[in-house]
Swiss-Prot record:
Biological source species: Cyanothece sp. (strain PCC 7425 / ATCC 29141)
UniProt superkingdom: Bacteria
Signal peptide: none
NCBIfam families according to UniProt: MtxBflmRegRemA, PRK04323.1
Pfam families, A to Z: RemA-like
Protein family per UniProt: Belongs to the RemA family.
Protein name (database record): Putative regulatory protein Cyan7425_4125
Length: 91
């Protein structure tokens, strides 16, 4: 099994197969999820003090904050999948 890693900014990397959702932090339900994760000790702040622009929800229940746009994280996620798909196909 290949491990796919996604760069979420500032040298921080998450495992692609653990990601459930990549969302914007603007809505009230997402803000509530962030608050609950902070209280449970399951919040990982990878923003380096910058504004949170993407919230990544992992299958372990961890919530990861990133300073890059959700679209950018999603594109990196898709690129990591495409690279794997093209490298595994016989030519």
């Amino acid at each position: 099994m290949d491990i796919k890693l996604i760069n979420i900014g500032f040298g921080n990397i998450v495992s692609a197969h653990r990601v459930i959702a990549i969302v914007s932090p603007e809505s009230s339900p997402i803000k509530r999820i962030i608050t609950e994760a902070r209280e449970k000790g399951q919040l990982i702040d990878a923003t380096y003090g910058r504004r949170t622009r993407a919230v990544i929800i992992a299958d372990s229940g961890h919530v990861i904050l990133s300073a890059i746009q959700p679209e950018t994280v999603a594109n990196r996620f898709l690129l990591s999948r495409d690279v794997h798909d093209s490298s595994s196909s016989p030519c």
